[in-house]
Each structure stands twice: as C-alpha cells, then as structure tokens.
C-alpha cells in the first residue's frame, strides 16, 4: 500500500482529504470528483496537514524555512513565487520523512502563483498554478488559485500513482522534474 502525507498551505488540507476519500472508496458528496475510487485499498493517507505559518513549519516539520516576504494579519507566511517553489519542496520532503510516508506533497502560495511539490525521495515533481493572487490582498483570485492548486495536486498524484509521469511532463504547468537514478 502506498503511504502519502501532505503539508499544505494554500490548499488548506483538501489535497489530503481528497486522496483519503478516494482511498476509502467514498462516493457522492464525500467522494473525490477527480480521483473517484481509483485509490481504494491501494493508498493510505498518513497525515494531511494544513500549515500556513512559519512557526508551524518549524515545529511540525522540523524545517528552517526562509523568513517570509510578508505576513498576513492571521500570521500566515507570504512568500513571493520563487521562494514558494523552494518551500513547497522543503515541505514535501519534510512531511514524507517526518511521517515515514512513501510520498510527500507540499503546497504553498503567497504572492504570485501557487507551488505544488510531490516527492518520494527519488523523484521530485514541481508544479504551479496559472492563477496569480496575493494572500495580503484577498479577492476571488485567492479561491481560484486554491481550487486550481487542489486539482493540479491531485492530477500530479494520480499521474504518479499510475506511473504516467511522461504524460504529466507534457503539461506546461509542471515546471521541474528531478529523478535521482541509481
């Protein structure tokens, strides 16, 4: 059984929830629109964490992320896009290692497009949203970016689960792939 853990910021834990719904065979309102029941009995969610703050990243994941460019009124970190990409990788790797999962998924978005990372210790996939938004200036783009981030995270995980990485890499939103081959 494939074990997955998520450390999520702008996707608010919904990626882990959707994977769990599919793995549990939930249908209807409880089910996953994107994954269906494809993962039933084949995947286990070790943890699905919503971690919007730097202090949360430090205490829960044991990482030392860069200081945020800005901080929201609620204390949420707000990095610019380039730093979000680096932090998403840190989050995915740390949640995988910390929980003993086979796969870690990290998502974060502050100012710009959202960053999505999937890491299994050998393969690191880095994707992004197309939607630009600013966490410090909330408007409808925040929600659009979140929904696209959830969908793309699930599409990325599904491609990984199905061993369809070559097809995934044809998507323009998958920015980087690192394969550490023996």
From Swiss-Prot:
Pfam families: HcgF. Signal peptide: none annotated. Belongs to the UPF0254 family. NCBIfam families: PRK00962.1. This is UPF0254 protein MK0012. It comes from Methanopyrus kandleri (strain AV19 / DSM 6324 / JCM 9639 / NBRC 100938).
């Amino acid at each position: 059984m494939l074990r997955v853990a998520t450390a999520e910021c702008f996707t608010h834990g919904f990626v882990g929830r959707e994977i769990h719904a599919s793995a549990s065979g939930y249908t209807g309102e409880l089910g996953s629109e994107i994954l269906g029941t494809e993962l039933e009995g084949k995947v286990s969610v070790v943890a699905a964490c919503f971690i919007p703050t730097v202090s949360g990243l430090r205490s829960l994941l044991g990482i030392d992320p860069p200081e945020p460019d800005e901080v929201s009124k609620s204390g949420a970190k707000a990095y610019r896009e380039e730093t979000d990409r680096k932090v998403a990788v840190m989050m995915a790797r740390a949640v995988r290692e910390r929980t003993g999962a086979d796969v870690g998924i990290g998502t974060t978005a502050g100012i710009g497009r959202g960053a999505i990372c999937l890491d299994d210790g050998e393969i690191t996939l880095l994707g992004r949203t197309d939607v630009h938004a600013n966490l410090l200036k909330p408007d409808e783009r925040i929600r659009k970016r979140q929904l696209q981030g959830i969908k793309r995270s699930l599409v990325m995980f599904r491609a990984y689960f199905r061993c369809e990485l070559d097809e995934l890499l044809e998507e323009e939103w998958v920015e980087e792939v690192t394969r550490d081959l023996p």
